[in-house]
Amino acid sequence: MFIWTSGRTSSSYRHDEKRNIYQKIRDHDLLDKRKTVTALKAGEDRAILLGLAMMVCSIMMYFLLGITLLRSYMQSVWTEESQCTLLNASITETFNCSFSCGPDCWKLSQYPCLQVYVNLTSSGEKLLLYHTEETIKINQKCSYIPKCGKNFEESMSLVNVVMENFRKYQHFSCYSDPEGNQKSVILTKLYSSNVLFHSLFWPTCMMAGGVAIVAMVKLTQYLSLLCERIQRINR
């Protein structure tokens, strides 16, 4: 009797010991799984924040481009590319300007005014040529305005080089107003469609990247929940 009881006790002890070992293994697996889930959750949160930050930055870039580049592009009326032939290029007069010489320091100087008249091939009109749209805003009498500096001789030398280039290449492309309201043409568009495309390309890529990151994280979370439900059903 004593021997039988001792054997039973020993067997029960071994069974309890095995169960304790299995329980420890299971607890360890659950702990590892929780750690893995926590790490994945933190990584997913960071990925979502990165995607949202990319989208916010792209929206801010769209806003800045919209009030600067896109606005100037839409306001420009010189949209038709044409051919111009030089009629006359000459320095007519000088104008006063001011340049910065340091913090809260401005000095007066002068720049020569170059006037270039061209013949617009499509209409045969004699029109004044401007370098860019900004040239008209600075001084409507000058086709080309050099940067204001303290050395007038350098400005004069630069304008002479530009004038000689016009006389050398008398046939060139220019941009005119297709409506004919502006009696002038420009040589170079500051904001062409090509510049506009390249300026909007990178914010669009950033927006697409942010949306893709958020979508992939959400898809991963959905598939994870779906797999968990399937495993529960199979059990």
From Swiss-Prot:
Coiled coil: none annotated. Residues 68-194 are extracellular. One of its GO terms (biological process) is regulation of vasoconstriction. The chain crosses the membrane at residues 47-67, 195-215. Expressed in kidney, heart and brain. Highly expressed in ovary. Expressed at low level in other tissues. Keywords: Glycoprotein, Ion channel, Ion transport, Membrane, Transmembrane, Transmembrane helix, Transport. GO terms for molecular function: calcium-activated potassium channel activity; ion channel inhibitor activity; potassium channel regulator activity. Residues 1-46, 216-235 are cytoplasmic. N-glycosylated. Its main location: membrane. The keyword Translocase does not apply. Belongs to the KCNMB (TC 8.A.14.1) family. KCNMB2 subfamily. The ball and chain domain mediates the inactivation of KCNMA1. It occludes the conduction pathway of KCNMA1 channels, and comprises the pore-blocking ball domain (residues 1-17) and the chain domain (residues 20-45) linking it to the transmembrane segment. The ball domain is made up of a flexible N-terminus anchored at a well ordered loop-helix motif. The chain domain consists of a 4-turn helix with an unfolded linker at its C-terminus. This is Calcium-activated potassium channel subunit beta-2. It comes from Homo sapiens (Human). The gene is KCNMB2.
